[in-house]
Each structure stands twice: as structure tokens, then as C-alpha cells.
């Protein structure tokens, strides 16, 4: 029997980006908040010290900062006819672990989804007709651009994003992204200093008639003090961002933007190494009354609260809803139910170029450093004669020249021996690449549920992922690969190779940690688990914050939109819910 603890106003599951933002906003509003974090305490000064953080073997290869599958594994299959099997190691995606979550080891790409993304079904239907959407399960998200844009602004200024605005209050700006939706003000910091490869990419894209612009980056281009008064340092371009924490205080993370302020507030409590097992509902199932969790000693405890906020990694949010019976489970056969619906991923391709006479210095890198074009992203180009909708941003980034992972060689090079050594020597300074980050649109048969066979160490069913790349997304990716082929020509490289996506999602090789959907927001409780404020339709004192709320995934990294949704939900709670608890949207 779990020991019942004194009641709190709010209990938050997880202290990554969303949990720290919700914690800061709700404590500022005067609420007593406790956050339960499954992983350990992690702090920049003591855990990410610059003296040992740049350890490629420990962090990039052995995945020291990531969730151990022994704590939470998942099963996967490509379609309903297959039997799902456990992923014994995380490969395709890498969830975070501990305070800061995946916000510790990310690169820093900080995009805004476009206005058309939030009304995607309406937008595409009006432009192309309903038949164009084929078997896609697209739906509008709920908020208008005017409603959600200020929340993007808050997250960008929290993080100190380095970039160049492309659309200021409807006026296209030179040097920025002409395809972005209108923003209220410029980025807080100017763009990063561009390395040779990205500069060369930008020049060639201009020659082809495209619109290159600097990647919006949560790596600091200059010293910065954010609105909470937290000081950040200028990026040193060390090349240790993705899979690493930043010991230089130069990459935005919960630790460098929010947590130092939050943990000093008297109405906030953080309990680490505490794993939430279940959200407990009232007998009628209409309200949450508490969460049950285990602490670091294995003791089972119950934390009552007036408000329960799930802020885990998106996949974990969905699993917690399923385990707690918050909302009806989605059924891909009937199409009914909402929890588990519209699981999406990211659809990518890439080009690798090798030269004889370059000197790229790839070790001068940063997580979010490069030039991008959005000419083939979203609906920036006409799809009328194409057999798909959606698109991809195409970027040339220079993230690292680390010795274990960065060994570019020409096609046909032996995998070992003297010729391999010579090829790696020649390729290191002479290789560059650019890649696409494509949209992932929902279909009926891609979804999340609980596995009927495999359980975790607490006896709870594992999350089961049923996913394969939809025909629409494969067609889109092949079209983008065709564009990449054309883009390689002006470089006159000695070798140029372009990858092409194949059906059959494989969970082993790393692809991207951009898992979205499963607990999606929307306007209709029959097709969405959450309303437009990320509040459960079925249990109104539960809010679920994260990429799990995305009704689809766009052709860009999700973190900027995750941060915006966190601020959007926090404002709804503080301005509306705490004044009049209950459903914020009536049906």
C-alpha cells in the first residue's frame, strides 16, 4: 500500500523543457508545485564540467545521458500483421534521462512550425481539395497563429536564439527565411558565424535561385542574459553538442535557462529518481486525484494534487495516459478512440560530397550551425501536379569533426586496412554534406498502444509502436532526394552520393529523436485526446505537454514548437484554469 503524502496544488511528471517551463510559470503564479523526475539530478557545473564533458566514447557512443532501456523499453513493429518485439537498445531515437531530459543533449535547432501547420487540414483542403489528402489523417491543431505566436517568442527569448527574422509583422526581411510565418520581433541574438561548408552551400543555393538563411540556433552567438536573469556564454564552436551537455553555458537547456531560478523558489520541490507509475482517477474516472510513484529506495508513494501535468518525453506521456486510462485508446481498425492516434516521426534524406582541394575544418562546429533553405518545405511549393503533400527543409550544418564518428570516405573504400586509413585522412578535410528534414503525416495504421505481451520491471505493459513510413511521405522524400541530386551539381565535387528513403522503418540505426503524436491536441474530442490548451478532454485536471500533442510533424525540428506549447498551456492554466477549474473548452 502506497504511503499518502500531503496534498500539493500541482504535480508534474518530468523536468525537461516542458516540466521546467510549467514549473516556473505556475510557481510564479503562486501555486505549490512538486516535480517528479525519474532520472538523476544533473547540473552544468558538477555534471557537465568542461574538463571532461567532451568525451565522445562516453557520451556519443556509450550514450551516457540517454534513457537506459532497462528502465523503460518499448516494442516495435511496422504493421498490424507483425508481432512487435522489444527494442533492447535505443537506436532510431534517443530519449533523455534525468533533469533536463532530451533538452540536455539536443543540438539547438529552434524552429517555429508555420501558421499553415496549425490549420493544416483546412489549408491543404482549400488549396488542393479533399481528394489530395488521400488516406492521410490530417487535422487542425486548434490555436490560431495570432494566439500561438507570442508563445514562440517567449521560448526564443528564454533560450536566446541566434538567428535572422525573415518575416517581421508581415514584411519579408532580407537574409532571413521568407517562408516563415509573421513574427512580432527579431531574434534575441544575431546568427552564428558560418563555417566554410555552410557558407559555400548558401552561395550555391543562391546561384540556383533558392533562399538560404542561417539556421535558428539555441547556441549563443554572443553573451546573453535571458528574461529570468540567467546569464549564458558565447559558443566556442567546440563541436560537442548533440549527445552532449554544454559545459560552456552556451547551449540553451533547462539547466542554462530555467532550472537555476526554479529550484530556488520556496513553493517548488523537485524529487529526483522518482518514477511515476500511474495517475490515479476518482471512482467515476472524471478527475485525477493523485499520482503513485516509487522513490530511489523503491518505496511506493502517493502524491495527491489538484492538477496533474504530464511533461515526460512524448512517448512516455502517451504510455502514462494509457496506463492510467485517461481517455479512450485508439483503435486503428475502427478508427475510433484518441490516445495513441496520429503517431508520426520524421522523414529524412541526405547528400554527401567529397572534394580533392577543400579545407573544411569540421572540428569547428556547433550543434545548430549552418545554412538552410525552405523552398521545398511544407506548402512553400506547389503540389498540384505531385503525388504527395508535405516537404522538407534542406540544411548544411557543421556540427562536429569528432574522431570516432566522423570518418567520411569515398564510395568503394574498404572498411579497414591501409586503404581505409588513407581514405579517412583524405576525406576528413574534404567532405561536406547537406540533408533534408521532412514532414511526417499521420495515417490510420501508425499508432501507439500498450503491448499485450511484454512488461516492465513494475509489471506494467510496455509501449508498442506500430509505424512505417506512409506512401505519401516516401513519395515526398524521393522528390526531395531528386532535388538534392540537382543541388549537388554546382559544387563540382569529386564524389556526390544522395540517400533515398525505403519503406520499412528500422529501429536500430539512429535517425532522429523527433517522435510526435499519440496524445494530440485538436478541436474535436472524438479525434483528439487534448483540447487546444493541451487539457485532457476526458479528465480536465490533467494537462499533457510535449510533442505528443502534435497532430502531425512538420519538416523541421520539434523543440521550438514544444516550448511554445508549454508556454501556451501555462498561460491557459494561470489565466483561466486556476480561476475557474474545469474544462476550458466546452463541447
Describe the residue ranges of each PLM region.
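Conserved redox-cofactor binding core of oxidoreductases
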Residues: 59-61, 67-76, 85-92, 109, ...
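Residue-level detector of alpha-helix initiation sites
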Residues: 16-17, 192, 196, 315, ...
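Conserved hydrophobic helix-helix packing surfaces used for dimerization/oligomerization
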Residues: 10-12, 33, 542
Amino acid at each position: 500500500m502506497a504511503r499518502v503524502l500531503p496534498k500539493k496544488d500541482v504535480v508534474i511528471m518530468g523536468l525537461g523543457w516542458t516540466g521546467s517551463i510549467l514549473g516556473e510559470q505556475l510557481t510564479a503564479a503562486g501555486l505549490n508545485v512538486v516535480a517528479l523526475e525519474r532520472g538523476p539530478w544533473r547540473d552544468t557545473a558538477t555534471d557537465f564540467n568542461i574538463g571532461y564533458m567532451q568525451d565522445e566514447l562516453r557520451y556519443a557512443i556509450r550514450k551516457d545521458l540517454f534513457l537506459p532501456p532497462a528502465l523503460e523499453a518499448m516494442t516495435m513493429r511496422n504493421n498490424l500483421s507483425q508481432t512487435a518485439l522489444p527494442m533492447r537498445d535505443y537506436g532510431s531515437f534517443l530519449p533523455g534521462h534525468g533533469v533536463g531530459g532530451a533538452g540536455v543533449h539536443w543540438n539547438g535547432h529552434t524552429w517555429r512550425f508555420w501558421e499553415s501547420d496549425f490549420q493544416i487540414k483546412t489549408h491543404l483542403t482549400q488549396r488542393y481539395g479533399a481528394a489530395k489528402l488521400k488516406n492521410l489523417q490530417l487535422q487542425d491543431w486548434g490555436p490560431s497563429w495570432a494566439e500561438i505566436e507570442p508563445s514562440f517568442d517567449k521560448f526564443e527569448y528564454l533560450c536566446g536564439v541566434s538567428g535572422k527574422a525573415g518575416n517581421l509583422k508581415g514584411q519579408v526581411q532580407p537574409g532571413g527565411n521568407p517562408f516563415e510565418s509573421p513574427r512580432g520581433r527579431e531574434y534575441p541574438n544575431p546568427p552564428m558565424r558560418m563555417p566554410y561548408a555552410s557558407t559555400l552551400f548558401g552561395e550555391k543555393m543562391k546561384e540556383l535561385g533558392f533562399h538560404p538563411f542561417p539556421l535558428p540556433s539555441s547556441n549563443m552567438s554572443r553573451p546573453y542574459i535571458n528574461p529570468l536573469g540567467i546569464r549564458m556564454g558565447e559558443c566556442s564552436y567546440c563541436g560537442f553538442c548533440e549527445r552532449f551537455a554544454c559545459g560552456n553555458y552556451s547551449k540553451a537547456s533547462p539547466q542554462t535557462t530555467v532550472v537555476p531560478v526554479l529550484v530556488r523558489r520556496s513553493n517548488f520541490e523537485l524529487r529526483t529518481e522518482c518514477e511515476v507509475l500511474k495517475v490515479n482517477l476518482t471512482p467515476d474516472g472524471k478527475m485525477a486525484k493523485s499520482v503513485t510513484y516509487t522513490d530511489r529506495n523503491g518505496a511506493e508513494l502517493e502524491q495527491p494534487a489538484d492538477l496533474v501535468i504530464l511533461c515526460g518525453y512524448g512517448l512516455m506521456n502517451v504510455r502514462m495516459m494509457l496506463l492510467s486510462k485517461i481517455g479512450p485508446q485508439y483503435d486503428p481498425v475502427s478508427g475510433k478512440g484518441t490516445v495513441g492516434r496520429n503517431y508520426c516521426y520524421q522523414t529524412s534524406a541526405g547528400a554527401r560530397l567529397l572534394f580533392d582541394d577543400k579545407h573544411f575544418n569540421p572540428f569547428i562546429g556547433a550543434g545548430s550551425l549552418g545554412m538552410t533553405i525552405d523552398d521545398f518545405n511544407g506548402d512553400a511549393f506547389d503540389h498540384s501536379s505531385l503525388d504527395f503533400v508535405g516537404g522538407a527543409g534542406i540544411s548544411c550544418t557543421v556540427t562536429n569533426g569528432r574522431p570516432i564518428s566522423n570518418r567520411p570516405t569515398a564510395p568503394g573504400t574498404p572498411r579497414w586496412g591501409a586503404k581505409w586509413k588513407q581514405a579517412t585522412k583524405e576525406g576528413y578535410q574534404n567532405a561536406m554534406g547537406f540533408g533534408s528534414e521532412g514532414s511526417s503525416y499521420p495515417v490510420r495504421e501508425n499508432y501507439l498502444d500498450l503491448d499485450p505481451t511484454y512488461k516492465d520491471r513494475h509489471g506494467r505493459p510496455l509501449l508498442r509502436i506500430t509505424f512505417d513510413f506512409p506512401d505519401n511521405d516516401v513519395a515526398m522524400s524521393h522528390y526531395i532526394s531528386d532535388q538534392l541530386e540537382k543541388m549537388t551539381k554546382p559544387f563540382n565535387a569529386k564524389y556526390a552520393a544522395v540517400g533515398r528513403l525505403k519503406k520499412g522503418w528500422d529501429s536500430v540505426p539512429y535517425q532522429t529523436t523527433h517522435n510526435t503524436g499519440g496524445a494530440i491536441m485538436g478541436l474535436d474530442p472524438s479525434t483528439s485526446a487534448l483540447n487546444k490548451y493541451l487539457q485532457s478532454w476526458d479528465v480536465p485536471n490533467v494537462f499533457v505537454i510535449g510533442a505528443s500533442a502534435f497532430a502531425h510533424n512538420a519538416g523541421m525540428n520539434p523543440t521550438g514548437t514544444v516550448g511554445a506549447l508549454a508556454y501556451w498551456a501555462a498561460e491557459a492554466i494561470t489565466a483561466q484554469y486556476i480561476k475557474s477549474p474545469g474544462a476550458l473548452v466546452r463541447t
